[in-house]
């Protein structure tokens, strides 16, 4: 997610508006460390409407948030990651982190 995890929650309905959320710098640093180490493929998901793609990409670039893919327009509901494992990779490799909105402690949660 972007709002409430990488930037303080923003909205297209009320301030702070999309594109102007305050960066959660420690969370951004933790995510960028994963990206830079090549230990993860970073796919950001958001309920921001597709019409805000340019604004969102500009915001992510301006705030130094590195990622591989951006999925927009998701509903405000549970997001489920499904992944398999097999004899060649016998340990489940999918993980999810749920964190309180606007909390700046992603690094601790990644341990």
Residue ranges and their predicted role:
Residues 2-111:
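HAD-like aspartate-dependent phosphatase fold
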């Amino acid at each position: 997610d972007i709002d409430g995890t990488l930037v303080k929650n923003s909205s297209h309905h009320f301030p702070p508006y999309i594109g102007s959320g305050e960066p959660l710098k420690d969370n951004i640093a933790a995510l960028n460390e994963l990206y830079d180490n090549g230990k993860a493929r970073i796919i950001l998901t958001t309920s921001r409407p597709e019409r805000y793609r340019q604004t969102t990409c500009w915001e992510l670039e301006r705030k130094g948030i590195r990622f591989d893919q951006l999925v927009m327009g998701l509903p405000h509901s549970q997001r489920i990651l499904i992944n398999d494992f097999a004899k060649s990779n016998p340990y489940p490799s999918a993980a999810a982190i749920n964190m309180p909105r606007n909390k700046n402690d992603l690094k601790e949660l990644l341990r």
